[in-house]
Swiss-Prot record:
Coiled-coil blocks: none
S-S bonds: none
EC number: 7.1.2.2
Cell location: Cell inner membrane
Matches recorded under CDD domains: ATP-synt_F1_alpha_C, ATP-synt_F1_alpha_N, F1-ATPase_alpha_CD
Organism: Anaeromyxobacter dehalogenans (strain 2CP-C)
Site (Required for activity): residue numbering on this chain: S362
Protein name: ATP synthase subunit alpha
Function statement: Produces ATP from ADP in the presence of a proton gradient across the membrane. The alpha chain is a regulatory subunit.
Main location: membrane
GO cellular component: a single term: plasma membrane
Mode of membrane association: Peripheral membrane protein
Record's keyword terms, sorted: ATP synthesis, ATP-binding, Cell inner membrane, Cell membrane, CF(1), Hydrogen ion transport, Ion transport, Membrane, Nucleotide-binding, Translocase, Transport
UniProt GO molecular function: ADP binding; ATP binding; proton-transporting ATP synthase activity, rotational mechanism
Length: 510
């Protein structure tokens, strides 16, 4: 065998050329104990709070506790194979998630990894999960409406862009339905929607995605799911992942909406982590910083000033109450952080009043300044009328002979309750809401309400047929309201004439 010196020297030269002087330094510790997805690690003296760690099998972990002789970390993934004594590496990274237009129409997990079987996201940008909320100077007061398509909300508890409006109520009272209707109503409004499902059944999330697809809403929506079977750290992180993705649109001068469904499950996941990390428990066994958990999340919803691009992020957090108890720890915390709340009541729901909004307790602290003038004109007295009706209805149970004025008020109240009823996944444009509420609250030439002669059980049919009639015979009225956003004398005159005409052709059944 011939040894060729030039060949050998060429190979040696190539190897020298490829030789790198770079030395990789990795700080590695070992697991002292691991239970229920929380590990205690010895030997990571340089670890920072919120840093990502690498466990065996490529599983990531998040540093939550820094103690004198060890580090407490939450394992974000399956932890059954992780044993005592296993090595754990520091990554030096803070948790980041993909952001951008590429996420629209996708379903991702609590860390932004796609779970819809449609391949990688190919997102061009990444953002840190934990960033500070915009300061006072960067903000502007809420002044633009964010329509939900639900008469009871847009008329009585209006929501503005950049607002945080809490939706709370017992289980199965229609909280998610209100949120989904809001997404459906904003089709074509250049509003990017993010739905964060925390601790939900996977079948429930699949149903929500299916509904959004059916109505063509998935093209401007991203679903972030940390389901009931996911580890507690994923359920704790999912809302922050969602808000980080939504902030990308807010900071680029666009408008976004985020729905957290629901934050009580995030608080439960955080309580679980805190107790396993042996942090001292407080009221209802929640840790002392559970308020900060939600406040730092909800403060990231904001209406930015013109100098910052005038973008907005509206938040609709959902909280589940137990037996209507609004004074429990988590509900009171979130009520104090948000700009108002919509309270859904199981009693109303079972009576067939849907959406089951308790108008008395529900408020919107800043939405009034975002409501369009036309809605203010027609719905000004609606809340008071409904409150009077509820009060009288409670007294009327005890009295048999009621005077005529009381009977009139009760009959009118019953019709107003019917007027505010609405089917699921059937949001109405604001001009159509204004027309229906005008018919319910304004008076005809004789000084009576337009729907005074309509039997209570036929009000819903009257309202549906009224819109069909106006679409067919007087389409200009709705267009004029949409353009002017106010009811001037000309529109009122046309609307009164149309209502008079409709009264002549509407047939009362039975």
């Amino acid at each position: 065998m011939e040894i060729r010196a030039d060949e050998i020297s060429r190979i040696i030269r190539e190897q020298i050329k490829d030789y790198g002087k770079k030395v990789e330094v990795a700080e590695t510790g070992s697991i002292l104990s691991q239970a229920d997805g929380v590990a205690r690690i010895y030997g990571l003296a340089g670890a920072a709070a919120g840093e990502l760690l690498e466990f065996p099998g490529g599983i990531r972990g998040l540093v939550l506790n820094l103690e004198e002789d060890n580090v407490g970390a939450a394992i974000m993934g399956p932890y059954e194979h992780i044993r005592e004594g296993d090595p754990v590496k520091r990554t030096g990274l803070i948790a980041e998630v993909p952001v951008g237009e590429e996420l629209l129409g996708r379903v991702v997990d609590g860390l932004g990894n796609p779970i819809d079987g449609r391949g990688p996201l190919n997102a061009k940008h990444q953002r840190k999960i934990e960033i500070k909320a915009p300061g006072i100077v960067k903000r502007k007061s809420v002044h633009e409406p964010m329509q939900t398509g639900l008469k009871a909300i847009d008329a009585l508890v209006p929501i503005g862009r950049g607002q945080r409006e809490l939706i709370l109520g017992d289980r199965q009272t229609g909280k998610t339905a209100v949120a989904i209707d809001t997404i459906l109503n904003n089709k074509g409004n250049n509003l990017y929607c993010f739905y964060v499902a925390i601790g939900q059944k996977q079948s429930t999330v699949a149903r929500v995605v299916d509904t959004l697809k059916k109505h063509g809403a998935m093209e401007y929506t991203t679903v972030i799911s940390a389901s009931a079977s996911d580890p507690a750290p994923m359920q704790y992180l999912a809302p922050y992942t969602g808000v980080t993705m939504a902030e990308y649109f807010r900071d680029s001068g666009r408008h976004a909406l985020i729905i957290y469904d629901d934050l009580s499950k995030q608080a439960v996941a955080y309580r679980q982590l805190s107790l396993l990390l042996r942090r001292p428990p407080g009221r209802e066994a929640y840790p002392g910083d559970v308020f900060y958990l939600h406040s730092r999340l909800l403060e990231r919803a904001a209406k930015l000033s013109d100098k910052e691009g005038a973008g907005s992020l509206t938040a609709l957090p959902i909280i589940e109450t137990q037996a209507g108890d609004v004074s429990a720890y988590i509900p009171t915390n979130v009520i104090s952080i948000t700009d108002g709340q919509i309270f859904l009541e199981s009693n109303l729901f079972f009576q067939g009043v849907r959406p089951a909004i308790n108008v008395g307790i529900s408020v919107s602290r800043v939405g009034g300044s975002a409501q369009i003038k036309a809605m203010k004109q027609v719905a000004g007295s609606l809340k008071l009328d409904l409150a009077q009706y509820r009060e009288l209805a409670a007294f009327a149970q005890f009295g048999s002979d009621l005077d005529k004025a009381t009977q009139e008020t009760l009959a009118r109240g019953e019709r107003l309750v019917e007027l505010l009823k609405q089917g699921q996944y059937a949001p109405l444009s604001v001009e159509k809401q204004v027309i229906q509420i005008y018919a319910g609250t304004q008076k005809d030439a004789g000084g009576h309400n337009w729907i005074r002669s309509v039997p209570t059980e036929q009000v819903v049919r009257y309202m549906a047929e009224l819109l069909e009639f106006l679409d067919a015979r007087h389409p200009g009225i709705a267009k004029a309201i949409a353009e002017k956003k106010a009811l001037d004398d000309g529109i009122r005159k046309d609307l009164d004439a149309a209502l008079t005409e409709f009264a002549g052709i509407f047939k009362i059944e039975g």
